[in-house]
């Protein structure tokens, strides 16, 4: 029997991983145990095993065909996990590459995952820019507020297309500065 598959997306620095992890912790205390899977980590495991990337941020620079092959392999691994328990897939709706936006969940991954819900975590572009500038643990390309907002627009468009292709609902969750608990509660209400 298929368990619920929820995809949580957002641009780098929006706080999607933080919001999702906090929600998972609260739901676990209530007895609802999702397996949280980071799609980028699953892809990195494949890329690293093949000697293609030594850190996650290098994967964005791989050629599109290599990225697509890695996505497909990671999607298969995650789909197998959903047979055992509900899964929350932490990923990006789109990945900004030097050659344009790459869908984070192309048709071959969507077919495997068949998500029930696609969640897009967002906030204002200037808040994301400030978060990125203060995060010294990642090697991110410098972007403007306008380019971050364009990326968020592309994420919404991609999320809706994922919903059209799978029948999944699409939910926007706002993660404003200082209001992470509100974002967590909104996410929990969708995951229950």
UniProtKB/Swiss-Prot annotation:
The protein's enzyme class: transferase
One Pfam family here: AAA_17
Catalytic activity: AMP + ATP = 2 ADP
Enzyme Commission number(s) from the entry: 2.7.4.3
Compartments where found: Cytoplasm
Keyword Kinase: yes
Keywords: ATP-binding, Cytoplasm, Kinase, Nucleotide-binding, Transferase
Sample GO molecular function, one term: adenylate kinase activity
Domain of life per record: Archaea
Gene3D superfamilies (alphabetical): P-loop containing nucleotide triphosphate hydrolases
Protein residues bound to ATP: 10-18
A GO term from the CC aspect: cytoplasm
Family the entry assigns: Belongs to the archaeal adenylate kinase family.
Subunit structure comment from the entry: Monomer.
Protein name as catalogued: Adenylate kinase
Organism: Methanococcus maripaludis (strain C6 / ATCC BAA-1332)
Gene responsible for this protein: adkA
